[in-house]
């Protein structure tokens, strides 16, 4: 099939971006003719030339007006529509809020729901500023059109919670939404030298073998709940250490850790390229996010054999089985609840968690994920042929 994939920034660095790159490479490997429409692209391999017949991927640069963020969003949506209409594709799948596509994958969630949830962590006046902020108004306008009948042939949600949000806010029929969970490369996190890697990382960071090591991975600390994680950790009875990985301004959180008297026990590492070894060094993954469509980091933690403690509002909570491989947080701002869930998760038998996660994640392979995507593609192409 000749397939167009739309992503404003295409790269194999970063969670959502790596996912799109993975889809493109997997589909190209199966012999499909893949065309990437992006405003910019950057990656670690030579295939990121404008056209690569060897990789089966062709890149098309979409003009984007730089400057104000709302202008960038709108110009990408308008220009990608213009360029896509100049070509004939069997399937057009967008990973962005755009104006011309057959399939939209709502990997970034529902913006209307995010604005609702962020009221929990924003000052009271921000709610009113959002109503006049042109960026939010543009995103909401595109999102509304995107979910209007006639502007899509199928929608893919990465969790059942995400599906319910779209139905609730926009009235999209349930039959028009397919839930396909994110994939994970289990082998990437299944190091046969697990204990050796664990000891190396702990020694480098000054973490004792007997310390309970908690890991937080995610960029955008405010939304993903780092403040709650730090405050909850300060209440733990066990001897613990917290590793924080991700891109954001850490100074606010460093000051809070100092205020609580726990600064020496919180390690801010920034973004890293070798995150696998930190999963292996940890005893538990903590992710008390305020809103998250589906956290790839939770899947990665499970693949590394960690119990996961995360918010129910995280789509990835649907793969957490309480009391077996982790626990869920009902209120991501309730640090007492988070502390209790962490202590409960640390009591789980680690070998049992490792074995359970390994078996549970078998259907989450890239091979199975792409098979599910292709089933949707075939359904959509069938509809297109029926409608002429």
Please provide the spans of the model-predicted regions.
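Short hydrophobic beta-strand element within catalytic cores of glycosyltransferases
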Residues: 307-310, 320
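Aromatic "clamp/platform" in nucleotide-sugar-dependent glycosyltransferases that forms part
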Residues: 271, 290
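Membrane-proximal helix-turn-helix segments that form the acceptor-binding/catalytic region
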Residues: 132-158
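A conserved mid-protein helix/loop that constitutes part of the nucleotide-sugar donor-binding site
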Residues: 18-22, 212-235, 251
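Short glycine/serine-rich donor-binding loops of glycosyltransferases
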Residues: 295-298, 316
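Short, structured helix-loop element that forms part of the nucleotide-activated donor/catalytic region
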Residues: 48-51, 199, 226, 241-264
């Amino acid at each position: 099939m000749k397939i167009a994939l739309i992503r404003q920034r295409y790269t194999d660095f970063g969670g959502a971006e790596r996912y799109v790159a993975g889809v493109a490479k997997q589909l190209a490997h199966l012999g499909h003719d893949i065309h990437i429409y992006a405003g910019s692209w950057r990656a670690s391999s030579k295939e990121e030339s404008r056209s690569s017949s060897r990789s089966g991927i062709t890149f098309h640069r979409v003009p984007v007006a730089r400057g104000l963020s709302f202008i960038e969003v709108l110009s990408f949506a308008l220009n990608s529509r213009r360029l896509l209409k100049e070509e004939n594709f069997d399937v057009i799948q967008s990973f962005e809020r755009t104006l011309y596509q057959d399939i939209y994958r709502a990997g970034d969630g529902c913006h209307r729901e995010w604005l609702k949830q962020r009221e929990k962590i924003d000052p009271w006046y921000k709610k009113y500023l959002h109503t006049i902020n042109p960026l939010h108004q543009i995103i909401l306008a595109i999102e509304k059109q995107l979910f209007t009948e006639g502007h899509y042939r199928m929608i893919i949600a990465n969790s059942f919670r995400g599906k319910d949000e779209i139905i609730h806010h926009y009235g999209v029929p349930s039959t028009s939404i397919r839930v396909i969970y994110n994939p994970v490369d289990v082998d990437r996190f299944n190091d046969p030298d697990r204990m050796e890697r664990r000891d190396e990382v702990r020694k480098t960071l000054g973490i004792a073998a007997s310390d309970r090591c908690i890991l937080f991975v995610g960029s955008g600390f405010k939304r993903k709940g780092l403040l709650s994680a730090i405050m909850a950790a300060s209440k733990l009875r066990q001897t613990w250490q917290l590793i924080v990985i991700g891109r954001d301004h850490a100074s606010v959180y460093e000051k809070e850790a100092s205020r609580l008297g726990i600064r020496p026990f919180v390690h801010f590492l920034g973004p890293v390229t070798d995150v696998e070894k930190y999963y292996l060094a940890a005893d538990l993954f903590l992710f008390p996010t305020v809103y998250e469509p589906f956290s790839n980091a939770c899947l990665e933690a499970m693949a590394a054999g960690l119990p996961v403690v995360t918010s129910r509002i995280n789509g990835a909570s649907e793969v957490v089985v309480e009391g077996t491989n982790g626990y869920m947080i009902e209120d991501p701002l309730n640090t007492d609840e988070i502390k209790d869930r962490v202590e409960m998760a640390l009591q789980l038998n680690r070998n049992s968690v490792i074995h359970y996660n390994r078996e549970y994640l078998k259907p989450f392979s890239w091979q199975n994920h792409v098979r599910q995507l292709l089933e949707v593609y075939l359904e959509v192409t069938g509809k297109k042929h029926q409608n002429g």
